[in-house]
């Protein structure tokens, strides 16, 4: 009887070990493409994203989460570092697309600071990748509760790029 007890105990432990090993699995999700950052030190990941050519040259790279959108405006697709807060050709903004009384934040000439780095532009696959960080100023100077917003550790990775479509052939 004691032998049966020890056998059952070993059998029980073996079943538990097998069950635990079988229930462990790796759920690896690759986040490709991606547009994410820390917004005021809180993780922020876009649900939708795009990169589009603009009529005067350059590109808009944007990521949206619900009604909130981050837009990076760059004068070219050249892989390099673009400094924000110097001019209006290179700018970053954050806003709520549908809110009437929500603040809108932007960088521009002598306004805000930061940088956008294009690390890769793959013309064959039509994707763009890079990093960003910026502090954008509230466009409503009277809003003392929300003077600025800061995005750090920002990454856009393999965002689909749409070139400017010319309908005049």
Predicted regions and their residues:
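Acidic, metal-coordinating catalytic segment for phosphate/diphosphate chemistry
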Residues: 32
């Amino acid at each position: 009887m004691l032998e049966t007890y020890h056998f059952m105990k070993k059998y029980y432990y073996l079943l538990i070990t097998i069950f635990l090993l079988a229930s462990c699995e790796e759920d690896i999700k690759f986040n490709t493409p991606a547009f994410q950052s820390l917004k005021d030190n809180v993780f922020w990941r876009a649900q939708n994203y795009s990169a589009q050519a603009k009529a005067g040259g350059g590109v808009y790279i944007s990521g949206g989460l619900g009604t909130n959108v981050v837009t990076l405006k760059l004068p070219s697709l050249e892989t390099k570092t673009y400094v924000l807060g110097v001019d209006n050709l290179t700018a970053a903004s954050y806003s709520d697309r549908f809110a009437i009384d929500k603040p809108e934040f932007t960088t521009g000439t002598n306004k805000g600071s930061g940088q956008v780095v294009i690390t890769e532009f793959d013309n064959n696959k039509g994707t763009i990748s890079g990093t960003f960080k910026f502090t954008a100023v509230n466009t409503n100077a009277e809003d003392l509760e929300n003077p600025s917003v800061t995005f750090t550790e920002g990454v856009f990775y393999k965002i689909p790029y749409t070139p400017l479509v010319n309908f005049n052939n």
